[in-house]
UniProtKB/Swiss-Prot annotation:
Domain FMN hydroxy acid dehydrogenase, residue spans: 1-360
Keyword Protease: no
CDD domains referenced in this protein's UniProt entry, alphabetically: alpha_hydroxyacid_oxid_FMN
Annotated source species: Oryza sativa subsp. japonica
Protein name in the entry: Peroxisomal (S)-2-hydroxy-acid oxidase GLO4
Binding-site positions, a 2-oxocarboxylate: Y27, Y132, R167, R258
Function noted in UniProt: Oxidase that catalyzes the oxidation of a broad range of 2-hydroxyacids to the corresponding 2-oxoacids, with a reduction of O2 to H2O2. May be involved in a general medium- and long-chain fatty acid catabolic pathway such as alpha-oxidation.
Entry GO terms, CC: peroxisome
Main location (coarse class): other
Gene: GLO4
EC number in record: 1.1.3.15
Amino acid sequence: MEDNLPVNVREYQELAKKALPKMAYDYINGGAEDEHTLRENIAAYTRIILRPRVLVDVSKIDMSTTLLGYTMRSPIIVAPTGGHKLAHPEGEKATARAAASCNAIMVLSFSSSCKIEDVASSCNAIRFYQLYVYKNRNVSATLVRRAESCGFKALLLTVDTPMLGRREADIRNKMVFPRSGNLEGLMTTDDHDTTNGSQLERFARATLDPSLSWKDIEWLKSITSMPIFLKGIVTAEDARRAVEAGVAGVIVSNHGARQLDYAPATIAALEEVVRAVAGAVPVLVDGGIRRGTDVFKALALGARAVMVGRPVFFGLAARGEAGARHVIEMLNGELEVAMALCGCRSVGEITRSHVMTEGDRIRSLL
């Protein structure tokens, strides 16, 4: 056991900032434009107060939950973030092993720096795959087939990126993204010309399809048997349309605040989406989760599970596979403590009555 291990996500972030080149750190940590939503994703959690119940026998805590019939040790999923080789030479393979050792589902990014096949063969685990639909539909279709043939269990379609958000740190740094193993043989990411700013931004303009619409859900369903989640839902209107489209679940996400600045913080949008879905499909949430108490708050507001991206990346950058694993373990440990101190023996016992939101406090004064 190493001495002086980080004891929270913030300390891992500080280590990652020291370990990474400025361009890489700014890429993973940055947000869109003024970064208001980036800050708010985290700050919104601080405005939710816990309401603990006491004199409950919490000698045994069960954090397990299920999603699509798969049992998870806890409701914490590793979110899709691109370019893990920016953080560690083993990239997503190291992250996959870390997740598997914690019995956590990992979602592999479309922008993975490791091949789908290499990640799949790195360890035995339940994995999902995150997809963008590109102008060249054959690229997306090929990736779906590869993921399905490698045993991935679900598809997460990102729906909030008809074009890339304006990430000013990447523009300023003239961000150059590493070769993506996912896209090898399909299209190139080798153009390193940064004359006009971010190479990533230029690549996205050339490939992302701004014409993507609800009718494309049917196309995607026609080419795969994997259940489909829509990632990037923040309104009741879109949540209801997602259910009508027959998807398997929705993910309340603002793309880590990297797309539209001044979009709502995800935890602030969660309850609206949960109410609109009305139990028809599971609702997941990502963005801003830095503590086990944040996970608890999301579950209390109706999320089936949460997805955590940047913290795992920070762990990978700071200490490799061991760091990524430790971040997941820390969050699990914090969640267990929060459950015990709130009188919840299982995630099923976490209810809306265990939290007070800012809106609740305002309504109580009327």
